[in-house]
């Protein structure tokens, strides 16, 4: 049974900070999503720069970004909706990036601190407690 996205494709303003960042600098949002989706193997900066190059040279960043939507869907068992991943990114690039970013945040992963930051946060040793006497 497929789970559902935790927010709609057009619910960008549920996280206005990410919506503004994505509107003016989608390469940063994409880099963050890619870093989490690839579990830190590719890095935010590298993917963000590659996204920017595709944007400038080809003009179709959706050719690259839709593959990360597929990764997120596979990881969390989400439906390919409202249309295929490539069509969603082609027509609604910023909305798709915002939805993916929100999905990661809702599932406990903070894209703004990257994969390694999330792993450090998850695996942080407990604070030592001392008795006051």
Curated annotation (Swiss-Prot):
The chain crosses the membrane at residues 49-68. Keywords: Membrane, Transmembrane, Transmembrane helix. It is found in: Membrane. Its main location: membrane. It is a single-pass membrane protein. Belongs to the cornifelin family. This is Protein PLANT CADMIUM RESISTANCE 7. The gene is PCR7.
């Amino acid at each position: 049974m497929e789970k559902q996205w935790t927010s709609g494709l057009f619910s960008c303003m549920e996280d206005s900070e990410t919506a503004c960042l994505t509107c003016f600098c989608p390469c940063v949002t994409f880099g963050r999503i890619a870093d989490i989706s690839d579990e830190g193997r590719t890095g935010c900066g590298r993917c963000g720069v590659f996204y920017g190059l595709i944007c400038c040279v080809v003009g179709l960043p959706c050719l690259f970004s839709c593959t990360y939507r597929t990764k997120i869907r596979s990881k969390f068992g989400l439906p390919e909706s409202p249309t295929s991943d490539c069509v969603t990114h082609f027509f609604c690039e910023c909305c798709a990036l915002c939805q993916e970013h929100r999905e990661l945040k809702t599932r406990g992963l903070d894209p703004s601190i990257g994969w390694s930051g999330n792993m450090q946060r998850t695996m942080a040793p407990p604070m030592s407690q001392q008795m006051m006497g």
